[in-house]
Amino acid sequence: FIRLFTPLGVEEEGLQLYVGYLKKVIAMRSRMEFEQLVEMMDQQNVNFVRCLTNLFKDIVLAIEENSEILSGLCGEDGIVYAICELQEECDSRGSVILNKYMEYRQLAKLSSEINAHNTNLLAVGGGPEGPDPREVELYLEEILSLMQLGEDYTEFMISKIKALTSVDPELLPRATKAFRSGSFSKVAQDLTGFYVILEGFFMVENVRKAIKIDEHVPDCLTTSMVDDVFYVLQSCLRRAISTSNISSVVAVLSGASSLLGNEYHEALQHKTREPNLGAKLFFGGVGVQKTGTEIATALNNMDVSSEYVLKLKHEIEEQCAE
């Protein structure tokens, strides 16, 4: 029936009706899936990523499969109009999904606990232990998946608009703004804020643990903390860069730099500042060989750490360029 609007000369009305129909279909499908998700909220792992993926998939397919009809009514302007209108469903339904995820994982409460834990560390006598870093890592991977989904969807839709060649120039800024300043984008920014807090906590706790349990490794020139610390930093920085969010990368990179320049640097220096080290070596005895090995290992720690810093810097630059 939609093809009848062109002979009648009411293409714009036909476009509005057809896009309105597409919006209703997408809203209905998303609402049904969301209701199923809510019913499973008492379970340990609810798949919010799949729920958001299906919403994006429905929107993209609605545009892809109906491009001919949309352009037949109002040219490529019809496609842009449909994209902007369907983005309202992304803003509406997508925001609900992200908000429900943040509620499900109690990210606001978790972030408050982390901030309180950080404050307690500065107090005399410390305070209660913070959240379990292993649990935090699970949430970080979930948040990363949700953030990547949102960014990939946004980039795809904006690139699709820019690829159109005969669009009213005034529509392009409006379309781009619909993606970058809509309610979904704003909720995604809230999620990004929680990500930065959780990632910072995870990185600090694991680096401190690696330093605390540092031990000599048989047949190895360095102690265990060197590989452990740089593995943690590498993992956290890779995850931050994968978010494609500049503020996240800067925050995590700043945290990594602070850890290297302060706590890790202090740990490297600790062994070389051992009291009466020279006397132990000079007077000899049973402990000489052990002490000499410890000094050599401490120096190797510094040397290898310098290499790892340069390697990490190179990896960061490469991944950012990609």
Positions of PLM-derived features:
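Extended alpha-helical rod/solenoid/coiled-coil scaffold segments used as assembly/tethering elements
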Residues: 46, 141, 145-158, 162-177, ...
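Extended, noncatalytic alpha-helical scaffold/tether regions
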Residues: 1-191, 195-217
